[in-house]
């Protein structure tokens, strides 16, 4: 019965089409399969980018589609680059990026180093550590909003237990000083497991015979760590920093859930400011210029970083 089905399928396939496919070169067949994907990428990514660039030179407003659209040249870009509020937003974003990356790399590598050393309950501990990464930012935001509650939040009571500061005397989300750190803590809790997994992959890729040779040469554990482990794991660490840096630069949902950009503008990151300009103030041309500036910034920094990463890999 199976043979009869195959025979019917073979008869249903036009012989001329089969001959044409067999007559194509490998390169031509590759283009046949790749072309739909390229067209899809052009439609989803390239065309909107070109359209955004065009809008950035106009005064277009999406809530006034019938209004006259005027060409304003570089005025939008000039206003953005000379606006002190924009630079304050950039500073808040840089603060968030620096501390989240620092904490995630240090804690993530430390956890990877711990888990790489086999012990009882290793698999269970790994599963528990990875759990936060599996949650959505909205869930994490709600979870930490509850933890930060001055009256009933466990975070405030933990601070009181270790420092003696009354739990009700401070608010992580309502304080201008503490609000940025509340986001750093929540994001670190959520994404440190990602860095840990990448570092763990790097640690487990190091052959055992390298450490055995070091033991024969009587190299101390400290020297093995700094001269062997760190250099071999460094490309993995840099890759984790690249991924997390790009994602944190685009951070939106977790911040909106926790602080909404407040209090004041202390946690107003570039992504939130861009959303306000585009969909609350409806300054589409201005926000398009802002988006292009952010795109060029991220693309430029990522390109420089990737070159540095490639040099590290070539060592």
Predicted segments, located by residue:
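A structural signal for multi-pass alpha-helical bundles of membrane permease subunits
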Residues: 26-315
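Short, Lys/Arg-rich, polar N-terminal cytosolic tail immediately upstream
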Residues: 1-24
């Amino acid at each position: 019965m199976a043979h009869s089905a195959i025979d019917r399928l073979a008869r249903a396939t036009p012989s001329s089409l089969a001959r044409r496919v067999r007559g194509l070169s490998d390169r031509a067949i590759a283009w046949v399969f790749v072309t739909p994907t390229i067209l899809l990428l052009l439609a989803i990514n390239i065309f909107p980018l070109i359209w955004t660039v065009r809008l950035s030179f106009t005064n277009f407003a999406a809530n006034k589609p019938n209004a006259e659209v005027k060409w304003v040249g570089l005025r939008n870009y000039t206003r953005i680059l000379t606006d002190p509020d924009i630079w304050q937003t950039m500073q808040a974003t840089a603060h968030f990026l620096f501390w989240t990356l620092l904490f995630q790399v240090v804690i993530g590598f430390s956890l990877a180093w711990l888990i790489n050393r086999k012990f009882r309950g290793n698999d269970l501990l790994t599963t528990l550590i990875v759990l936060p990464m599996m949650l959505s930012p909205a869930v994490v935001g709600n979870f930490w909003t509850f933890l930060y509650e001055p009256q009933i939040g466990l975070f405030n009571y933990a601070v009181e237990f270790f420092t003696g500061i009354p739990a009700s005397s401070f608010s992580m989300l309502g304080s201008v000083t503490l609000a940025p750190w509340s986001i750093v803590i929540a994001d670190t809790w959520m994404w440190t497991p990602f860095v840990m997994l990448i570092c763990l992959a790097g640690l487990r890729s190091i052959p055992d015979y390298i450490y055995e040779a070091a033991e024969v040469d009587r190299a101390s554990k400290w020297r093995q760590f700094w001269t062997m482990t760190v250099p071999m794991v460094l490309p993995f660490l840099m890759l984790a920093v690249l991924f997390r840096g790009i994602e944190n630069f685009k951070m939106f949902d977790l911040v909106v859930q926790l602080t909404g950009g407040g209090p004041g503008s202390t946690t107003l990151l570039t992504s939130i400011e861009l959303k306000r300009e585009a969909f609350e103030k409806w300054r589409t041309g201005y926000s398009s210029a802002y988006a292009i500036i952010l795109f060029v910034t991220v693309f430029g920094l990522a390109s420089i970083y990737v070159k540095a990463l490639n040099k590290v890999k070539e060592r």
